[in-house]
Amino acid sequence: MKRAILITAAAVLALVLLVPGASLYYESGGGRGCTSCHEMQTMYDDWHSSSHRGIACQKCHGGALTLDPAFHWNNAMRLVAHVRGDLPERIGFANHDVQAMTERCASCHRREYAAWHAGPHSASYARILLDKQHNTANKLMDDCLRCHGMHFERGIAELVTPISHTGPWRLRREDLSNQPSMPCLACHEIHRTGPVLTKVGANGSVPGPTQEIMPSSLAFFDRRTQESIPATDLPLPAMLEGARTVKMSPDQRQALCYQCHAPVYTRQVASGDDRTAIGVHEGISCLACHSQHGETTRASCATCHPKMSNCGLDVEKMDTTFRSAGSKHNIHWVKCTDCHGAAVPKRKASVD
């Protein structure tokens, strides 16, 4: 009996030491060691041409010194599958891996992470999927996971119960309660081809322009295909106001926004989750007013507007949802004629 226990303990210890030891060996090769497993060659090639090619694999994916038993157990199971020849058609990230990687993004992208973490796109599974007002009016369905929980491996019924208009609702996976339902990899593909990233300074700044116009990493993760689709390959919808075709900004970054902030099949402005601008803001990109990670808008009016409007009023104090969420004049769709009828007054003369 004691001998069996000792053999079992030795086997477990060997396995515990084998995986970190193997990880350390592969890490010493700067990524090339990973290609010893031939199924990793494609991913290595993608990384080697990406903006992150100057960053070692373990920096984002974890390595020998990662203090997460589940990480090493998962690697051990992958090793067993590899030895058995039980190889997946493609290698993807489990939801657990994605959540861990999101925290690692902060080590380099501090400003972006802070803005995302303080904004609505970091909303947790519990905040999104246990919302009483939403769930009472709209029955939860698998399609909810297209934007909220896109890396979750199963369906909505395995995540929330009950699936009905009457609660109380609870998460079947309580470990995901406080985890972000829209992590970094929802909108970014870390192996996307691009120029090598520049290391940030101690204050989080980088030399040169602070923001690329179209970062190569922008991509929407499609849970059906388990692929990240580049923003450059996503369509900008042809939006309508009644029968009229709405003028759209050509900013291709918006195509990513429209994957979730989308109209219904009629493509009418303000239908579904759409916020396409018409009226005084028609033709302006979402990103002209909303910051990419935090959706901060408080300073955005001053970017384009003089303080006073044609009416002689402070644009930030007008009766719109910019000033008050309860206003009947939504800032996305407000028109001069909403307040002035058919006669828009001429600009008031300034008083010296």
PLM features: residue spans?
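Short sequence/structural segments immediately N-terminal
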Residues: 1-352
